[in-house]
Amino acid sequence: MDPAVALVLCLSCLFLLSLWRQSSGRGRLPSGPTPLPIIGNILQLDVKDMSKSLTNFSKVYGPVFTVYFGLKPIVVLHGYEAVKEALIDHGEEFSGRGSFPVAEKVNKGLGILFSNGKRWKEIRRFCLMTLRNFGMGKRSIEDRVQEEARCLVEELRKTNASPCDPTFILGCAPCNVICSVIFHDRFDYKDQRFLNLMEKFNENLRILSSPWIQVCNNFPALIDYLPGSHNKIAENFAYIKSYVLERIKEHQESLDMNSARDFIDCFLIKMEQEKHNQQSEFTVESLIATVTDMFGAGTETTSTTLRYGLLLLLKYPEVTAKVQEEIECVVGRNRSPCMQDRSHMPYTDAVVHEIQRYIDLLPTNLPHAVTCDVKFKNYLIPKGTTIITSLTSVLHNDKEFPNPEMFDPGHFLDKSGNFKKSDYFMPFSAGKRMCMGEGLARMELFLFLTTILQNFNLKSQVDPKDIDITPIANAFGRVPPLYQLCFIPV
């Protein structure tokens, strides 16, 4: 057969398959924008700002609608009511991890972020129990965060009030906290291997948040054949996993079955206990993936929030001054801030919450999937369907947060100036797939920011009104622009 004829036949079959799949699924799925054969709704989506496109679609199709990434239908939940009903009220049914082809290529379904079913439940249960045993949610982990905050201050003093890019310094602090749990040690802030690891995580977040990755996720069959930045993600993860494997081997050589030093030891002991179970989820490959997930999630999200937070404090010096006034009044200069202080610092607490609400770090969340056929708001969503939950639609809800596009700590204060909780505050997602380290992340944000502002004034290189706070990436995660500032000792 002539190659040209064969190509035309293949494309025709693909075209007809696309039409059949899209039409056969529409009867059960929510309505949405009409997809084109093969490419779906890609031309109607702004891959530079997916969340904005979904908001526009919701104005036409309501809080539950379907879009197509290539041939694949994706159900989108928009607004607090729909997101809450799915992730909390129907938490078990919506607890699957949805399709994220670029990550799946690297992760192979292992670890905790992108695993599913029995594997995910067993690994998550083990992680939660082990993290609690190593102080998560207890005073002991707070002591570690406070100690790391003091190390961070000493490192910032070494800048001698000169302009500096805070990216890696702010990344080192939360990374060292999670390293103390995983590896039972911490890095020096100038350790080159440490800085290389930080750069790999940082670069991966930037790439994952790029428009190109959204294109790759739309057409996963082409990932292995296309050049582009998605290949750099695989290279970076290979570097990180190589380092993690080195540390695992070190632990294996000195393992004491009766005295676990850290998370890796606990996992290795569990592996030994289940060595005769051929169905065990506790393998070296699983340990590498789990540690890599914890390493990345425990570092990059908190460091990016800190970096964006300082940029906002530079932009709004009047907010910074109020926080420093409250720190001076409640904490003073002779001791470090602690979590007990938070209840006496409503304005500072409001600022920390508003930073997270405003930056909207993961606009469309990590994808979910339904674990069975689900009846949801008069629709039948088939088992395995990928679900996108718009966190932007919750964190930037204009009824709960008037003028949501404005940075305003008043969103979390009542008329008397007391801190005001909000059910709409879900930067860490919600339900069964909620971030395991939420409590630690909140602690780190509060203690790192207050300790920095207790010891330094922040000085911008430009007039505050000229500071650009527009993210340089808006897709998977919102990444702040690069900037420099001076840490002036008080």
From Swiss-Prot:
Cell membrane recorded as keyword: no
Assigned GO CC terms: cytoplasm; endoplasmic reticulum membrane; intracellular membrane-bounded organelle; plasma membrane
Enzyme Commission number(s): 1.14.14.1
Membrane topology designation: Peripheral membrane protein
Localization terms from the record: Endoplasmic reticulum membrane; Microsome membrane
Enzyme kind, highest EC tier: oxidoreductase
Keyword ATP-binding recorded: no
Catalytic activity annotation: an organic molecule + reduced [NADPH--hemoprotein reductase] + O2 = an alcohol + oxidized [NADPH--hemoprotein reductase] + H2O + H(+); all-trans-retinoate + reduced [NADPH--hemoprotein reductase] + O2 = all-trans-4-hydroxyretinoate + oxidized [NADPH--hemoprotein reductase] + H2O + H(+)
GO molecular-function term, one example from the UniProt record: heme binding
Pfam families in the record: p450 (PF00067)
Signal peptide (UniProt feature, chain positions): 1-25
Biological or metabolic pathway of the protein: Cofactor metabolism; retinol metabolism
Coiled coil location: none
Binding site for heme: 435
GO biological process terms held by the UniProt record: arachidonate metabolic process; linoleic acid metabolic process; organic acid metabolic process; retinoic acid metabolic process; retinol metabolic process; xenobiotic metabolic process
Protein family according to the UniProt entry: Belongs to the cytochrome P450 family.
Function per UniProt: A cytochrome P450 monooxygenase involved in retinoid metabolism. Hydroxylates all trans-retinoic acid (atRA) to 4-hydroxyretinoate and may modulate atRA signaling and clearance. Mechanistically, uses molecular oxygen inserting one oxygen atom into a substrate, and reducing the second into a water molecule, with two electrons provided by NADPH via cytochrome P450 reductase (CPR; NADPH-ferrihemoprotein reductase).
Protein name, UniProt field: Cytochrome P450 2C18
Gene responsible for this protein: CYP2C18
